[in-house]
Amino acid sequence: MNRRKFIEQTATVTFGLACMPSLLTAKQKQEIIFGHNNKRYRIDTKWGVLDFNRYPVKDCHEMVQDSKGRIILLTNETKNNIITYDKKGKLITTWGSEYPGAHGLTIFNENGEEVLFICDNNRHQVIKTTLDGRVLLTLNYPKETGEYSKPDEYVPTETTIAPNGDIYVADGYGKDFIIQYDYKGTYIRHFGGRGTEEKHLKNAHGICYDNRDKNNPVLIVTSREQHAFKRYTLDGK
């Protein structure tokens, strides 16, 4: 499922989780609708409500939806880094206690098996796992690029995965490079980085694989400080 479709389907959930209790109390007898133009969303204030003492959430940076419609929430709360809901908001499972800087979450169908990619700011790593948390691959700071001298310089925020399994990591809180690996985690190339030219990025916070043009897929990268999206070919041009 691409990001645009997922966002449209789950915006109700995201806004609902973000609402302040005071807002909900004041309007509990009214419909709460957000959005503009033809993209409007009605809040379901009862969706996904859990006992905070048992299932705490710090920051929720991202959610994804698997092929069965389950919604997977990522938080940097190490009591339960992953919280999985069904479509109706009922808790299915939780797992994860080793991701204190959990930030980016990507789901990918790998030969019929869905896997997750977690960006951890504190660990300066990207971790690939099964849907139930078994670690399959860990990508450490990309020393092989020649751009990094220590792990602290690398603070990945997001990944996107190409159909062939190539992994693109956006170092959004680090040096703003996009690092490309093959499906085994072998380094291929890097591009972007900080600078003043059009090819450079400033806070490369998000990245996605855009295949709307099937013959010419591209990468779309956010350059947050420039208030811009930048398009790159799959080889970084």
Residue ranges: model-predicted function:
Residues 86-88, 130-132, 182-184, 233-235:
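Short loop/turn segments that connect beta-strands within beta-propeller blades
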Residues 73-93:
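Beta-propeller domains
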Residues 5-25:
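N-terminal export signals
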Residues 73-77, 116-121, 169-172, 211, ...:
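Conserved beta-strand positions in repeat-built beta-propeller and related beta-rich domains
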Residues 80-82, 124-126, 176-178, 227-229:
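Structural signal for beta-propeller blades
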Residues 53-68, 98-113, 144-166, 196-218, ...:
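Beta-rich, blade/repeat-based domains predominating
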Residues 27-45:
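Blade/loop signatures of beta-propeller domains
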Residues 43-48, 93-96, 136-143, 188-193:
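Beta-propeller fold detector
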